[in-house]
Amino acid sequence: MAPHDLLTALRDQNPLVHCITNYVAMNIAANVVLAAGASPAMVHAPEEIAEFTPICGALTINIGTISTPWQASMMAAAATASAQNIPWVLDPVAHFISVYRREAAQQLLAQRPTILRGNASEILALTGETGAGKGADSGDSVDAAQGAAKKLAAQFGTVVAITGPVDYLTDGTREAQVSGGSSLMPQVTALGCSQTALMGAYAATGPAFDAALAALAHFKVAGSTAAQRADGPGSFQMHFLDALANTQPFELAQVIR
C-alpha cells in the first residue's frame, strides 16, 4: 500500500494499539498515536495480556524501563501476537547496556517481531557487533548498521527500521530511506519511543514494510513542520503533535527515497 493510502486508512479505521512501553514514554506515545488517528492502550499487567492483546489491531513493545514483571507481560503479549498473526513492533532500547537487558531483547527477538525498530547502535549490537551507543542514544551512523539490518531481516523474517538523521528500512530484499525531520527531535525525551507506537498503528492497517515506511515518513514530515514553528524543544513537542494530526497524506511521499 502507498503511504498516503495507509495514512487515510489509519484515520478511517482508528485501530486499537496495545503499547507496552516505558514509564518515560507513556504520555507522549499515547498522544502521538492519538494525534495520528489511532487509539492507544497502555496495558502492561501480566494478568490482562491473554484477554487484551487478542482484541488489538497491533502490539508494540519497548524495553526502555524493563523489569521482571514487565518482561513477563512483554513475552506473553509477543507470544500471543505471533500465534494469532497480530502485527507487533519491537523496540530494544539500549539493550546493550546490561546482561539482563541483552537477554530480554534476544528472547523477544526470538518471537519474530513483525517490525524491529532501533537506532544504529541498537541494531548493530543485536548481531553481536560492538557499537558506540550511550544509553538510549546512538553513537553509530545509520549507514554503518545497514548490513546488520539486512542480516536481522533475513534471520528473523522481520522488517528492520534504523532511525537517525536519514532513516533506513529493509525487509532483507527491499530498501528505502526517509529524510527530513529536525535536530530538535532528539531533544524531546521519548519521542523516538513514541515512533514505535506509531509504527504499531500503521502495522494494524497494512503490510509491514509499507506500514513502517509510512510511520517513518509521517514522523519526518511532522518534525520538519514543527521545527518551522518551534522556539525550542518544549514548543516543538506541542507543534509536533499538531503536525502529526494535520499531515496530509500526499506529504508522506515527499520525504521517501
Curated annotation (Swiss-Prot):
Annotated residues for binding of ATP: 117, 163
Assigned keywords, A-Z: ATP-binding, Kinase, Magnesium, Metal-binding, Nucleotide-binding, Thiamine biosynthesis, Transferase
Binding positions (substrate): 42, 190
Cofactor(s) it depends on: Mg(2+)
GO biological process: thiamine biosynthetic process; thiamine diphosphate biosynthetic process
CDD domains for this protein: THZ_kinase
One Pfam family this sequence matches: HK
Catalytic activity as recorded in UniProt: 5-(2-hydroxyethyl)-4-methylthiazole + ATP = 4-methyl-5-(2-phosphooxyethyl)-thiazole + ADP + H(+)
GO terms of molecular function: ATP binding; hydroxyethylthiazole kinase activity; magnesium ion binding
Pathway the protein acts in: Cofactor biosynthesis; thiamine diphosphate biosynthesis; 4-methyl-5-(2-phosphoethyl)-thiazole from 5-(2-hydroxyethyl)-4-methylthiazole: step 1/1
Entry EC number(s): 2.7.1.50
UniProt cross-references to Gene3D superfamilies, sorted A to Z: 3.40.1190.20
Similarity-based family: Belongs to the Thz kinase family.
Function: Catalyzes the phosphorylation of the hydroxyl group of 4-methyl-5-beta-hydroxyethylthiazole (THZ).
UniProt protein name: Hydroxyethylthiazole kinase
Organism: Roseobacter denitrificans (strain ATCC 33942 / OCh 114) (Erythrobacter sp. (strain OCh 114))
